[in-house]
A protein has these predicted regions:
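Surface-exposed, low-complexity/disordered Ser/Thr/Gly/Pro/Asn-rich loops and linkers
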Residues: 15-26
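Short, solvent-exposed loop/linker segments at the N-terminal edge
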Residues: 181-189
């Protein structure tokens, strides 16, 4: 989910797509947010040679903590991240925290540190967003441009865990990717499958 959808689901904000409600939620992108959960790790998983935490989508500026150790900082919502957590996990309860920095504050830092001006889309509705000095910062963030406003949607500069987080463990090798291609020929379908394997060095 995202900060906005989680706040809606917990009845903290009203639907920002209704009427002019977007104007009432512009404070959200100026704050820092924290997600926290517990991972119960069994001995079977802990005994595996490889244990990785895979983040398929984090939007955008995050710090990932496992049992109070910062393992990674991110700044791009368009890519995935994989972290070796074998030496950071313990048997039983583990605490995973993801802290999200304000994309507006980060964007302002990057904008103000630049010694020259660059073109910025008029779709960046900084005025509605009540951004300091109406400064447009969309091009300084590796996140979806439409979050900053567009003619077809509201300005909702959100953050959050927008794709799955997966804890994976394995020995010796794993299936990294599977690609299946189908070709139809008359009354017959021919299916080709390519399977990519990753092996440990040993």
């Amino acid at each position: 989910g995202t900060i906005h959808t989680d706040l809606i689901n917990n009845n903290i904000i009203d639907d920002p797509f209704y009427r002019l409600n977007e104007h009432d939620v512009q404070w959200i992108d100026k704050k820092e947010w924290r997600y926290k959960t517990k991972l119960d790790v069994k001995v079977e998983a802990l005994n595996q040679q490889n244990i990785f935490l895979e983040f398929e989508g984090l939007d955008t500026y995050s710090s990932i903590y496992l049992n109070d150790s910062c393992l990674l900082k991110t700044d791009n919502m368009f890519r995935s991240y994989s972290i070796d957590v074998k030496n950071h996990l313990k048997l039983g309860e583990n605490i995973l925290e993801i802290l999200f920095d304000s994309p507006i504050k980060k964007g302002l830092e990057r904008r103000d540190n630049l010694s020259y001006n660059i073109p910025i889309s008029a779709n960046d509705l900084a005025e509605i967003g009540q951004v300091e000095g109406n400064k447009r910062v969309s091009v300084f963030n590796r996140k979806a441009g439409y979050h900053f406003g567009w003619d077809w949607g509201p300005r909702l500069v959100t953050s959050g865990i927008w794709k799955p987080v997966i804890l994976k463990s394995w020995n010796n090798f794993k299936i990294s990717d599977v690609y299946i291609q189908q070709k139809l020929q008359n009354n017959m379908a021919v299916i080709n499958a390519a399977v990519e394997l990753s092996f440990d060095k040993s």
